[in-house]
């Protein structure tokens, strides 16, 4: 990704984003700054920018981290703990903005376009982004949007990791009915997406990563997929993320794909105390010596 003249001017002129926010816990190596950006529909939305303490303006890797459904950007930022400071990278956690809803964007086209602008937004707030080392990491809806960002903007990313992602929005809509707040989620989905899967199947299809198997496979970008056989939110992960991994490998047998499974609760592994450090190490963002040991299985990508 190349930055234009206006962005370069902003990078030079803008100070590194201000002091550590009082709304965020004090960490030894990482500071958090609340910034704002203008979304695709013109609305101002917040984002949390995580930076190493004492960041001096040198080029730095950037992780784009979209949040899960109904979760705010600050809660998503807290999942990272002190890892950005320990690894020497930045993380931007945008609040997001869908077609109609903010915290339930579910892969809206405008939201994915906004995610692709996050390196420029971070740069405008004083971060000297190493454009060769931009990554996307998210869980649940954030994992869905990570995969869509990879499919639609493959040249932007040096790596992507999705934890327990939604991969089939048609299936998700009908499966919402089995959840405690399922009727509310279905109502929100109809508002955000524009109908039901029966009334507007294409609207659900274009928000589903499994619609973009060829693009994901041909992106030639390292991809990590994490999914649980005991997920009580996306209860059919073997038929969603598991199948997506198989299809990607089938489309490109040489795809740089890691496919892991276990028995954790929904997105429980996307946090600093669980699998997130291992995902970062695989992208060279965290030294292996700083990765806690933890036993989990790698699943061969063969069949469902």
Question: What feature does the model see in each segment?
Answer:
Residues 216-223:
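Short, proline-enriched alpha-helix->beta-strand connector loops that line the catalytic pocket
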Residues 71, 125, 132-179:
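Primarily recognizes the serine-hydrolase "nucleophile elbow" in alpha/beta-hydrolase
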Residues 229-235:
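Acidic catalytic loop of the alpha/beta-hydrolase fold
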Residues 106-127:
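Alpha/beta-hydrolase active-site loop
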Residues 17-60, 191, 288-304:
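A domain-start/cap signature at the N-terminus of enzymes
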Residues 224-226, 237-304:
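C-terminal catalytic histidine-bearing segment of alpha/beta-hydrolase fold enzymes
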Residues 70, 75, 171-215:
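Mobile cap/lid helix-loop segments that gate and shape the active-site cleft of serine hydrolases
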Residues 55-60, 65-104:
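Short substrate-entry loop that stabilizes the transition state in hydrolases
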């Amino acid at each position: 990704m190349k930055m234009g003249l206006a962005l370069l001017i902003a990078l030079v002129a803008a100070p590194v984003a201000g002091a550590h926010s009082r709304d965020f816990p004090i960490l030894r190596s990482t500071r958090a700054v609340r910034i704002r950006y203008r979304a695709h529909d013109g609305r101002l939305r917040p984002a949390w920018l995580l930076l190493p303490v004492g960041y001096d303006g040198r080029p730095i890797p950037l992780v784009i981290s979209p949040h899960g459904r109904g979760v705010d950007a600050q809660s998503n930022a807290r999942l990272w703990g002190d890892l950005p400071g320990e690894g020497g990278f930045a993380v931007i956690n945008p609040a997001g903005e869908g077609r109609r809803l903010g915290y339930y964007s579910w892969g809206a086209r405008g939201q994915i376009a906004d995610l692709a602008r996050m390196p420029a937004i971070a740069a405008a707030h004083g971060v000297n982004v190493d454009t060769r080392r931009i990554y996307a990491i998210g869980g649940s809806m954030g994992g869905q949007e990570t995969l869509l960002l990879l499919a639609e903007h493959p040249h932007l990313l040096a790596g992507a990791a999705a934890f327990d992602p939604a991969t089939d929005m048609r299936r998700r809509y009908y499966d919402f009915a089995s959840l405690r707040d399922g009727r509310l989620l279905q109502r929100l989905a109809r508002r955000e997406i524009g109908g039901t899967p029966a009334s507007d199947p294409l609207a659900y299809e274009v928000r589903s990563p499994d619609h973009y198997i060829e693009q994901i496979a041909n992106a030639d970008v390292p991809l990590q997929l994490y999914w649980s056989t005991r997920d009580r939110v996306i209860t059919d992960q073997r038929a969603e993320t598991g199948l997506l991994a198989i299809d990607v490998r089938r489309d490109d047998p040489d795809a740089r794909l890691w496919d892991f499974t276990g028995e954790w609760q929904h997105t429980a592994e996307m946090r600093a105390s669980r699998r997130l450090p291992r995902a970062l190490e695989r992208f060279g963002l965290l030294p292996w010596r700083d990765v806690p040991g933890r036993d989990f299985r790698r699943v061969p990508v063969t069949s469902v």
